[in-house]
């Protein structure tokens, strides 16, 4: 089993490190297991933009990389919300430009979803 490939994909989903290196490593890896993309990952990514740790363009690049990885599965029960987040953020030319305000709006939606889920309330 290629645990290193899965770890590299986990790093991308968690946006743990420099984005260009994460995307390059994820493209070169061949994970043998899937990695889950959860609401907490989307919250953390949107927060990076709202607090100034990442640019909106970086969020677009990250969302594209996550969205188009075959080995990334969306959190069960929240596929619609998370797929909508990835599609809208990864294709601003089809929806609206990604801005700090767009990220704040997504944060409210995602945090409300987490808060309404007894299993994740307070644990994202």
Region locations from a protein language model:
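Acidic, Ser/Pro/Thr-rich low-complexity regulatory regions
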Residues: 1-124
